[in-house]
Amino acid sequence: SRNVKEYGNRVYNRYPARSIFLVPRAILSHQADRPLNVLDPFMGSGTTAVETVLSGNVPYGLEMDPFARMVAEVSSSIFTGEELIAMRETFNTICANWIDFESEHIPQLTGIERWFKDGDLDLLLKLKSAILSLSPQRFLPFFLVTFADAIKPVSLMERQSLKPYISTKYAKITKDVLSSFMYSFEAHM
């Protein structure tokens, strides 16, 4: 699944349950006589919603996981050219100013600090504060998903594993906060 983009997949986040886009694409390609309302009762990260939008149909989905709902919302959103320019400007503003923000919005998770090198959690929280303060409401879900995707490369958690652990055998070389966020932004644009 490392090269799924080559085959048409739109990977907006490494959400563990994303499905293969070819199934909804094949089904929707045989329903071309009129626009459809498509219900996905287990929406996950929105693969069916994306294919539904791309085929000119209207997606509806149900998902209990709030993060998965946000990923699905972002992945199936259509932005105008002007909005894409505004998103880039917002991104540039965040990148230029994030370091001056306070480390707020600390997750109430026991032992969260152990997953990061010294100082990295503080830097991530500064970036999150900047995103929450500087992003227009229309773009906020996009920037939050981009931020979420940037966390794992900064953390000590193994990137290729869905199981959360820190390898004691092979020390992970982490990315810095800003370059990880920039990489995620470019990958999602």
Each language-model region and where it sits:
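Nucleic-acid modification enzymes, centered on SAM-dependent nucleic-acid methyltransferases
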Residues: 1-33, 55, 60-189
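Conserved SAM-binding loop of SAM-dependent methyltransferases across substrates and taxa
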Residues: 45-57
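A short hydrophobic/small-residue beta-strand
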Residues: 38, 49, 59-61
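Short secondary-structure boundary micro-motifs
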Residues: 44-45, 98
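Conserved class I S-adenosyl-L-methionine
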Residues: 35-44
